[in-house]
Amino acid sequence: MYRKDEVSYFIVDAHVALWDARPENQRNIHGKQFIDCFYDYHRNLSPESEVWPYEEYLYQGGERLMNDLFRDGYVDHAIFQPAQLGEFYHRGFGQTEEASALAAAHPDELTYNHNFDPRNGEAGLDQLRADAERFNLQGVKLYTAEWHGNSRGWSLEDPWAYRYLEACQELGIRNIHVHKGPTIRPLDRDSFDVADVDHVATDFTELNFIVEHCGLPRLEDFCWIATQEPNVHAGLAVALPFIHTRPKYFAQIIGELLYWVGEDRIQFASDYALWTPRWLVEAFVDFQIPEELGEYPQITTEQKKKILGLNAAKMYDIPVPPELQLPAAEEPAVGPRGADKTAESADHLVGA
Protein backbone atom coordinates (compact mmCIF):
# COMPACT_ATOMS: atom_id res chain seq x y z
CA MET A 1 0.00 0.00 0.00
CA TYR A 2 1.10 3.53 -0.70
CA ARG A 3 -0.18 6.52 1.24
CA LYS A 4 0.29 10.20 0.50
CA ASP A 5 -1.64 13.32 1.51
CA GLU A 6 -4.04 11.20 3.59
CA VAL A 7 -4.94 9.09 0.53
CA SER A 8 -4.17 5.35 0.42
CA TYR A 9 -3.62 3.29 -2.74
CA PHE A 10 -3.79 -0.49 -3.14
CA ILE A 11 -0.92 -1.50 -5.44
CA VAL A 12 -0.88 -4.44 -7.84
CA ASP A 13 2.24 -4.76 -9.96
CA ALA A 14 0.75 -6.64 -12.88
CA HIS A 15 3.99 -7.43 -14.73
CA VAL A 16 7.08 -8.72 -12.91
CA ALA A 17 9.71 -11.34 -13.69
CA LEU A 18 12.46 -13.31 -12.03
CA TRP A 19 15.06 -13.86 -14.73
CA ASP A 20 18.52 -15.36 -15.14
CA ALA A 21 20.65 -13.79 -17.87
CA ARG A 22 24.04 -14.64 -16.36
CA PRO A 23 26.72 -15.74 -18.85
CA GLU A 24 26.45 -19.40 -17.86
CA ASN A 25 22.78 -19.38 -18.88
CA GLN A 26 23.33 -17.54 -22.17
CA ARG A 27 23.00 -20.01 -25.01
CA ASN A 28 24.51 -17.72 -27.66
CA ILE A 29 25.30 -14.10 -28.48
CA HIS A 30 21.59 -13.34 -28.65
CA GLY A 31 21.19 -13.99 -24.94
CA LYS A 32 23.73 -11.25 -24.23
CA GLN A 33 22.16 -8.93 -26.80
CA PHE A 34 18.76 -9.35 -25.18
CA ILE A 35 19.80 -8.57 -21.61
CA ASP A 36 22.08 -5.74 -22.75
CA CYS A 37 19.09 -4.15 -24.50
CA PHE A 38 17.07 -4.55 -21.29
CA TYR A 39 19.84 -2.88 -19.33
CA ASP A 40 19.98 0.05 -21.73
CA TYR A 41 16.24 0.62 -21.19
CA HIS A 42 16.83 0.38 -17.45
CA ARG A 43 19.69 2.84 -17.14
CA ASN A 44 18.41 5.31 -19.74
CA LEU A 45 14.89 5.66 -18.31
CA SER A 46 15.61 5.34 -14.56
CA PRO A 47 16.54 8.09 -12.11
CA GLU A 48 20.28 7.89 -11.43
CA SER A 49 19.64 6.72 -7.87
CA GLU A 50 17.68 3.71 -9.15
CA VAL A 51 20.24 2.33 -11.63
CA TRP A 52 21.62 -1.10 -10.74
CA PRO A 53 25.16 -2.30 -11.49
CA TYR A 54 25.15 -4.45 -14.63
CA GLU A 55 26.24 -7.61 -12.80
CA GLU A 56 23.34 -7.35 -10.34
CA TYR A 57 20.94 -6.80 -13.20
CA LEU A 58 21.71 -10.17 -14.79
CA TYR A 59 20.02 -12.06 -11.94
CA GLN A 60 18.14 -10.65 -8.97
CA GLY A 61 16.91 -13.74 -7.11
CA GLY A 62 13.81 -14.26 -5.03
CA GLU A 63 14.98 -12.57 -1.83
CA ARG A 64 15.78 -9.32 -3.57
CA LEU A 65 12.51 -9.47 -5.52
CA MET A 66 10.51 -9.79 -2.31
CA ASN A 67 12.38 -6.86 -0.80
CA ASP A 68 12.16 -4.59 -3.86
CA LEU A 69 8.45 -5.21 -4.37
CA PHE A 70 6.89 -5.70 -0.96
CA ARG A 71 9.18 -4.13 1.62
CA ASP A 72 10.53 -1.17 -0.33
CA GLY A 73 8.15 -0.92 -3.26
CA TYR A 74 4.65 -0.43 -1.75
CA VAL A 75 3.32 -3.44 -3.70
CA ASP A 76 0.45 -5.43 -2.19
CA HIS A 77 0.35 -8.12 -4.88
CA ALA A 78 2.44 -8.87 -7.98
CA ILE A 79 1.89 -11.08 -11.01
CA PHE A 80 4.68 -13.01 -12.72
CA GLN A 81 4.69 -12.71 -16.52
CA PRO A 82 7.61 -14.93 -17.61
CA ALA A 83 9.19 -15.11 -21.05
CA GLN A 84 10.79 -18.40 -22.08
CA LEU A 85 13.29 -17.38 -24.81
CA GLY A 86 14.66 -20.90 -25.02
CA GLU A 87 16.58 -20.09 -28.21
CA PHE A 88 18.68 -17.59 -26.24
CA TYR A 89 18.97 -19.15 -22.76
CA HIS A 90 19.76 -22.73 -21.70
CA ARG A 91 17.28 -22.75 -18.79
CA GLY A 92 15.03 -20.11 -20.26
CA PHE A 93 14.99 -16.42 -19.38
CA GLY A 94 12.11 -16.39 -16.89
CA GLN A 95 12.90 -18.88 -14.12
CA THR A 96 9.87 -21.15 -13.90
CA GLU A 97 10.86 -23.25 -10.91
CA GLU A 98 12.16 -20.41 -8.76
CA ALA A 99 9.32 -18.01 -9.56
CA SER A 100 6.53 -20.56 -9.18
CA ALA A 101 8.01 -21.80 -5.88
CA LEU A 102 8.17 -18.22 -4.62
CA ALA A 103 4.53 -17.69 -5.57
CA ALA A 104 3.52 -20.94 -3.87
CA ALA A 105 5.31 -19.82 -0.70
CA HIS A 106 3.68 -16.36 -0.78
CA PRO A 107 0.20 -16.85 -2.30
CA ASP A 108 -1.18 -13.67 -0.73
CA GLU A 109 1.49 -11.59 -2.44
CA LEU A 110 2.32 -13.35 -5.71
CA THR A 111 0.45 -14.90 -8.64
CA TYR A 112 2.35 -17.01 -11.14
CA ASN A 113 1.37 -16.88 -14.80
CA HIS A 114 3.13 -19.14 -17.29
CA ASN A 115 3.62 -19.08 -21.07
CA PHE A 116 3.02 -21.12 -24.20
CA ASP A 117 4.19 -21.18 -27.80
CA PRO A 118 1.68 -22.52 -30.37
CA ARG A 119 4.56 -23.60 -32.60
CA ASN A 120 5.02 -26.50 -30.16
CA GLY A 121 1.89 -28.07 -31.64
CA GLU A 122 0.12 -30.97 -29.95
CA ALA A 123 2.90 -31.55 -27.43
CA GLY A 124 2.62 -27.92 -26.37
CA LEU A 125 -1.13 -28.28 -25.86
CA ASP A 126 -0.51 -31.24 -23.56
CA GLN A 127 2.06 -29.16 -21.69
CA LEU A 128 -0.39 -26.26 -21.37
CA ARG A 129 -2.95 -28.56 -19.78
CA ALA A 130 -0.34 -29.92 -17.38
CA ASP A 131 0.87 -26.41 -16.52
CA ALA A 132 -2.68 -25.20 -15.93
CA GLU A 133 -3.19 -27.96 -13.37
CA ARG A 134 0.24 -27.62 -11.77
CA PHE A 135 0.19 -23.83 -11.38
CA ASN A 136 -3.59 -23.29 -11.16
CA LEU A 137 -3.15 -20.78 -13.95
CA GLN A 138 -5.33 -17.70 -14.25
CA GLY A 139 -3.23 -16.17 -17.01
CA VAL A 140 -0.48 -16.66 -19.56
CA LYS A 141 2.20 -14.40 -21.04
CA LEU A 142 2.70 -14.59 -24.80
CA TYR A 143 5.73 -13.39 -26.75
CA THR A 144 4.81 -13.32 -30.42
CA ALA A 145 8.30 -12.26 -31.55
CA GLU A 146 10.06 -15.15 -29.82
CA TRP A 147 12.32 -17.23 -32.04
CA HIS A 148 11.63 -20.93 -32.54
CA GLY A 149 14.03 -22.79 -34.82
CA ASN A 150 13.92 -20.95 -38.14
CA SER A 151 10.75 -19.07 -37.18
CA ARG A 152 11.17 -15.50 -35.91
CA GLY A 153 7.65 -14.91 -34.72
CA TRP A 154 4.02 -15.98 -34.84
CA SER A 155 0.57 -14.41 -34.96
CA LEU A 156 -2.40 -14.69 -32.63
CA GLU A 157 -4.43 -15.40 -35.77
CA ASP A 158 -2.47 -18.57 -36.59
CA PRO A 159 -4.60 -21.76 -36.58
CA TRP A 160 -2.48 -23.33 -33.86
CA ALA A 161 -2.75 -20.17 -31.75
CA TYR A 162 -6.53 -20.52 -31.95
CA ARG A 163 -6.31 -24.08 -30.65
CA TYR A 164 -4.27 -22.89 -27.68
CA LEU A 165 -6.70 -20.04 -26.94
CA GLU A 166 -9.59 -22.49 -27.16
CA ALA A 167 -7.74 -24.65 -24.62
CA CYS A 168 -7.32 -21.59 -22.38
CA GLN A 169 -11.09 -21.10 -22.42
CA GLU A 170 -11.65 -24.74 -21.51
CA LEU A 171 -9.06 -24.62 -18.71
CA GLY A 172 -10.34 -21.38 -17.18
CA ILE A 173 -7.24 -19.37 -18.15
CA ARG A 174 -9.02 -16.10 -18.82
CA ASN A 175 -6.20 -13.54 -18.85
CA ILE A 176 -4.02 -13.48 -21.95
CA HIS A 177 -1.08 -11.10 -21.54
CA VAL A 178 0.57 -10.36 -24.88
CA HIS A 179 3.82 -8.45 -25.34
CA LYS A 180 2.93 -5.87 -27.96
CA GLY A 181 5.44 -3.14 -27.48
CA PRO A 182 9.01 -2.04 -28.02
CA THR A 183 11.22 -4.56 -29.72
CA ILE A 184 14.22 -5.97 -27.89
CA ARG A 185 17.41 -6.90 -29.69
CA PRO A 186 17.59 -9.21 -31.64
CA LEU A 187 13.81 -9.71 -31.99
CA ASP A 188 11.88 -8.32 -34.96
CA ARG A 189 9.71 -5.25 -34.43
CA ASP A 190 6.96 -6.33 -36.81
CA SER A 191 6.46 -9.60 -34.92
CA PHE A 192 5.22 -7.49 -32.00
CA ASP A 193 2.62 -5.68 -34.15
CA VAL A 194 -0.60 -5.19 -32.20
CA ALA A 195 -2.94 -5.75 -35.18
CA ASP A 196 -3.62 -9.43 -34.50
CA VAL A 197 -5.18 -8.60 -31.12
CA ASP A 198 -8.24 -7.20 -32.91
CA HIS A 199 -9.08 -10.54 -34.51
CA VAL A 200 -8.79 -12.73 -31.41
CA ALA A 201 -10.50 -10.24 -29.10
CA THR A 202 -13.56 -10.46 -31.32
CA ASP A 203 -13.50 -14.26 -31.52
CA PHE A 204 -12.71 -14.93 -27.84
CA THR A 205 -14.98 -12.57 -25.93
CA GLU A 206 -14.70 -14.66 -22.74
CA LEU A 207 -10.96 -13.94 -22.55
CA ASN A 208 -9.22 -10.75 -21.44
CA PHE A 209 -6.39 -9.60 -23.69
CA ILE A 210 -3.95 -7.45 -21.75
CA VAL A 211 -1.68 -5.73 -24.24
CA GLU A 212 1.57 -5.27 -22.39
CA HIS A 213 3.35 -2.00 -23.14
CA CYS A 214 0.07 -0.74 -24.68
CA GLY A 215 1.32 -1.41 -28.19
CA LEU A 216 4.19 1.10 -28.19
CA PRO A 217 5.31 2.40 -30.61
CA ARG A 218 1.91 1.64 -32.18
CA LEU A 219 -0.15 3.38 -29.50
CA GLU A 220 -2.67 4.79 -31.97
CA ASP A 221 -3.28 1.37 -33.51
CA PHE A 222 -3.78 -0.11 -30.06
CA CYS A 223 -6.22 2.60 -28.99
CA TRP A 224 -8.37 2.17 -32.10
CA ILE A 225 -8.55 -1.57 -31.40
CA ALA A 226 -9.15 -1.34 -27.67
CA THR A 227 -11.79 1.37 -27.88
CA GLN A 228 -14.19 -1.01 -29.66
CA GLU A 229 -13.15 -4.30 -27.97
CA PRO A 230 -14.22 -4.24 -24.29
CA ASN A 231 -12.05 -7.26 -23.44
CA VAL A 232 -8.81 -5.52 -24.46
CA HIS A 233 -6.79 -3.89 -21.68
CA ALA A 234 -3.62 -1.76 -21.53
CA GLY A 235 -0.56 -2.71 -19.49
CA LEU A 236 1.67 0.26 -18.63
CA ALA A 237 4.97 -1.64 -18.40
CA VAL A 238 7.72 0.27 -20.27
CA ALA A 239 5.38 3.23 -20.81
CA LEU A 240 5.55 4.28 -17.16
CA PRO A 241 9.28 5.07 -16.87
CA PHE A 242 8.87 7.83 -19.46
CA ILE A 243 7.20 9.69 -16.60
CA HIS A 244 10.77 10.53 -15.51
CA THR A 245 12.70 11.13 -18.74
CA ARG A 246 9.87 12.26 -21.05
CA PRO A 247 6.97 13.44 -18.86
CA LYS A 248 5.23 15.17 -21.76
CA TYR A 249 5.41 11.98 -23.82
CA PHE A 250 4.02 9.97 -20.91
CA ALA A 251 1.23 12.52 -20.53
CA GLN A 252 0.27 11.93 -24.15
CA ILE A 253 0.30 8.16 -23.63
CA ILE A 254 -1.86 8.18 -20.51
CA GLY A 255 -4.09 10.92 -21.92
CA GLU A 256 -4.80 8.91 -25.06
CA LEU A 257 -5.39 5.72 -23.08
CA LEU A 258 -7.87 7.40 -20.76
CA TYR A 259 -9.69 8.98 -23.70
CA TRP A 260 -9.93 5.88 -25.90
CA VAL A 261 -9.76 2.94 -23.48
CA GLY A 262 -10.91 4.27 -20.13
CA GLU A 263 -9.75 4.13 -16.53
CA ASP A 264 -11.11 0.62 -15.89
CA ARG A 265 -8.90 -1.08 -18.49
CA ILE A 266 -5.43 0.25 -17.66
CA GLN A 267 -3.03 -1.60 -15.34
CA PHE A 268 0.06 -0.44 -13.47
CA ALA A 269 3.21 -2.49 -14.02
CA SER A 270 6.86 -1.88 -13.19
CA ASP A 271 8.16 -4.66 -15.46
CA TYR A 272 10.47 -5.59 -12.60
CA ALA A 273 13.41 -6.01 -12.74
CA LEU A 274 13.56 -3.68 -15.73
CA TRP A 275 12.57 -1.08 -13.15
CA THR A 276 11.62 -1.13 -9.48
CA PRO A 277 8.09 -0.12 -8.46
CA ARG A 278 8.84 2.32 -5.64
CA TRP A 279 9.80 5.33 -7.72
CA LEU A 280 7.18 4.57 -10.37
CA VAL A 281 4.37 4.48 -7.80
CA GLU A 282 5.55 7.73 -6.23
CA ALA A 283 5.91 9.46 -9.58
CA PHE A 284 2.52 8.32 -10.87
CA VAL A 285 0.65 9.47 -7.75
CA ASP A 286 2.32 12.88 -8.08
CA PHE A 287 1.86 13.13 -11.84
CA GLN A 288 -0.35 15.72 -13.49
CA ILE A 289 -0.89 16.49 -17.15
CA PRO A 290 1.25 19.51 -18.18
CA GLU A 291 -0.68 22.70 -18.85
CA GLU A 292 0.45 22.82 -22.47
CA LEU A 293 -1.44 19.56 -23.06
CA GLY A 294 -4.75 21.07 -22.05
CA GLU A 295 -6.75 18.89 -24.44
CA TYR A 296 -6.34 16.11 -21.86
CA PRO A 297 -8.13 16.47 -18.52
CA GLN A 298 -6.17 16.03 -15.32
CA ILE A 299 -5.98 12.51 -13.92
CA THR A 300 -8.19 12.13 -10.87
CA THR A 301 -7.30 10.33 -7.64
CA GLU A 302 -10.00 7.75 -8.36
CA GLN A 303 -8.49 7.04 -11.77
CA LYS A 304 -5.04 6.62 -10.23
CA LYS A 305 -6.41 4.19 -7.64
CA LYS A 306 -7.94 2.04 -10.35
CA ILE A 307 -4.84 2.03 -12.50
CA LEU A 308 -2.41 1.40 -9.63
CA GLY A 309 -4.15 -1.70 -8.41
CA LEU A 310 -7.91 -2.00 -8.34
CA ASN A 311 -8.26 -2.95 -12.01
CA ALA A 312 -5.81 -5.84 -11.82
CA ALA A 313 -7.19 -6.90 -8.44
CA LYS A 314 -10.64 -7.20 -9.98
CA MET A 315 -9.33 -9.21 -12.94
CA TYR A 316 -7.44 -11.64 -10.69
CA ASP A 317 -9.87 -11.76 -7.75
CA ILE A 318 -7.24 -10.34 -5.41
CA PRO A 319 -8.80 -9.33 -2.06
CA VAL A 320 -8.74 -5.59 -1.41
CA PRO A 321 -9.26 -4.19 2.11
CA PRO A 322 -12.66 -2.45 2.29
CA GLU A 323 -11.12 0.92 3.10
CA LEU A 324 -9.09 0.80 -0.13
CA GLN A 325 -11.95 -0.16 -2.44
CA LEU A 326 -14.05 2.02 -4.72
CA PRO A 327 -17.69 1.49 -5.69
CA ALA A 328 -18.00 -1.28 -8.26
CA ALA A 329 -17.88 -0.08 -11.86
CA GLU A 330 -20.32 -1.07 -14.54
CA GLU A 331 -19.17 -3.06 -17.56
CA PRO A 332 -16.34 -1.28 -19.44
CA ALA A 333 -17.61 1.18 -22.00
CA VAL A 334 -16.46 1.27 -25.60
CA GLY A 335 -15.78 4.26 -27.81
CA PRO A 336 -13.91 7.48 -26.96
CA ARG A 337 -14.56 9.08 -23.60
CA GLY A 338 -15.82 12.56 -22.94
CA ALA A 339 -15.69 13.84 -26.51
CA ASP A 340 -18.14 16.59 -25.63
CA LYS A 341 -16.85 17.35 -22.14
CA THR A 342 -14.43 19.92 -20.80
CA ALA A 343 -11.43 19.54 -18.53
CA GLU A 344 -13.47 20.95 -15.65
CA SER A 345 -15.68 17.83 -15.68
CA ALA A 346 -12.74 15.42 -15.50
CA ASP A 347 -14.39 13.16 -12.93
CA HIS A 348 -17.00 12.21 -15.51
CA LEU A 349 -14.79 11.91 -18.56
CA VAL A 350 -13.92 8.24 -18.30
CA GLY A 351 -16.47 5.59 -19.08
CA ALA A 352 -17.16 3.08 -16.32
Language model region names:
Residues 15, 78, 112, 140, ...:
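Divalent metal-coordination and catalytic microenvironments
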Residues 138-139, 153-268, 293-303, 326-351:
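Catalytic pocket-lining loop regions of alpha/beta-barrel enzymes
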